UniProtKB/Swiss-Prot annotation:
Record-linked SUPFAM superfamilies: ADP-ribosylation
Signal peptide span: 1-18
Ranges where the TR mART core domain occurs: 31-223
The protein's name in its UniProt record: Putative NAD(+)--arginine ADP-ribosyltransferase Vis
Keyword Glycoprotein recorded: no
One term of GO molecular function: NAD+-protein-arginine ADP-ribosyltransferase activity
Organism: Vibrio splendidus (strain 12B01)
Catalysed reactions listed for this entry: L-arginyl-[protein] + NAD(+) = N(omega)-(ADP-D-ribosyl)-L-arginyl-[protein] + nicotinamide + H(+)
Gene Ontology terms: cellular component: extracellular region
Keyword Signal annotated: yes
Compartments where found: Secreted
Amino acid sequence: MNTRFLLLLCCLSFTTFSQPFDAIKQPNRSEEEVTQLAEDFKDWSKASNGWRYSFITANEKEAVEDFSISGYQTANDYLRATDTSTWGVAGADARQYIRTVKSALNKLPKYKGTAYRGTWVKLSLLNKLEEGDVLVEPAFTSTSTLPEVAKRFSVVHPNSPQRLKRVLFEVKINQGGHTIAGLSEYSKEAEVLFAPNAHFRITQIERTSNHTYIGVETVKASAVKNTQKYNLYSGEEVEASFWHSLVCT
């Protein structure tokens, strides 16, 4: 079997037989190994393009490429905004861009397996989270199949007046994840992207003084009933009427 393919299998099944959070707690592998694994994931992504990919447009490809560079900032700012009425023309442009990226995702390979995300979360939200709660991200959610990449995104504390804490997510992806590694300008990130409004059910939480480790699994919105649900960005409890107002149309 090809050595590079073996490395890719190792990457994709890093935590198959390990305890929760083992992979993300391990010392980082060498930069050379991480780069090679990312390259292998990029190759796998390209090889996994199905019939839907034949319908992807040049505009959609460009939108995904731009998303990984800077487009994510405008798109996610708009999706997370509580009031978009002041955006004017920029709001219309943002909505069109979001629709284009979402359309592209539906034509890119699906990924099922484990991925990771490093970020900062409001301490007020973390303090009330319990196993079984559902986190809803109104914006696009970026993850990586490489824990080393995920950890890089939680190194620098954001400039925010809110009290934040570093969080490392281990994500069991059952549905909703699409690899953009074959198109992304930052293909070394082995990125798996979720469209807005992704739902993640908490399966495990481990709190330490420096980090909070959270294990989640993807769930369909329709499957979430009688469960505490929080907006991952704002920390607010999500009500049904409020949630529908977040959907980008």
